[in-house]
Amino acid sequence: MPSRVPEGQARGWIIPIGGAENKENDRRILERFVRVSGADAADIVVIPTASRMHETGSRYEEIFKALGAARVTVMDFDTRRDCREPGRLKRIEEASGIFFTGGNQLRLTTLLGGTSVAKLIRIRNARGVSVGGTSAGASILCEHMIAGGDEGSSIVAGSVRLAPGLGLTNRFIIDQHFRERDRLGRLLTAVAYNPFAVGIGLDEDTAAFIGPDEVVEVEGSGSVTLVDPSEVSFSSIGTVEDGQPACMLGLRLHMLVTGATFNLKTHVASATALTQSKE
């Protein structure tokens, strides 16, 4: 569950990225992550635990330093015991930005879930620290995490597997590699099971920057598919058997690109910046 924001403070940015973000000639997503983490004063901790590729963390360390971050530390967790180590907790306390790499989201949540590190990351985000993640590192940011599922575009009972995430937000359900891996159906199904939450489907090289004001801003070369169940009038997901299609009425779907926004408080999507750029 998200930590409470102390009076007089603002929550930090939450930045899920759809994976395969540009790390070479157009680093605008990672550059903006550094910017909202403090720009040239950014103090970033990279957590590559979801990945089994040892060079993953060092690659992001190199990029964030090149983008002007003042300090970058790679911090891997191999055991749950690591999550209680005072030195690691102190380093997370010092960070102004925390970044999760891609890999396997279940590896990450089963190591970190319920630990002092997970609790501290929620507390730090509630006190203004930006937290981002790419691919599997994006999925784990929310409370209701998509752990797997089937390809396709329809709502089908039992077609998605859900597990507890890190719980920085309970207002969204996040999926990644969205268009590239045909994941509309599993996001729709996840939202059908959890109609309190808004679904965010992130194409590759595309991010949703969720601000302290709960406005989603899109950055990157692809699209964000946003599934809003706030006006659903009927759902049969609770009565159909696994493998069978379900009915939902009143579901709203928005396709957002860079410059478009969605306000979670008002449930209003906007393309004002896009229309102004054409004038």
Predicted regions: what they are:
Residues 100-102, 121-145:
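Catalytic nucleophile loop
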Residues 105-115:
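Glycine/threonine-rich flexible loop motifs
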Residues 83-97:
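N-terminal small/polar loop signature for handling phosphorylated ligands or for N-terminal nucleophile
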Residues 1-40, 46, 51-59, 64-67, ...:
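C-terminal and late-domain segments of enzyme folds
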Residues 91-94, 114-128:
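Catalytic-core regions built around general acid/base machinery
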Residues 76, 102, 125, 170-178:
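Short, structured patches in soluble enzyme cores that scaffold and shape functional sites
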Residues 49, 74-82:
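Short beta->alpha junction loops
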Residues 15, 45-47, 73-74, 99-100, ...:
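Structural recognition of the beta-strand scaffold that forms the well-ordered cores
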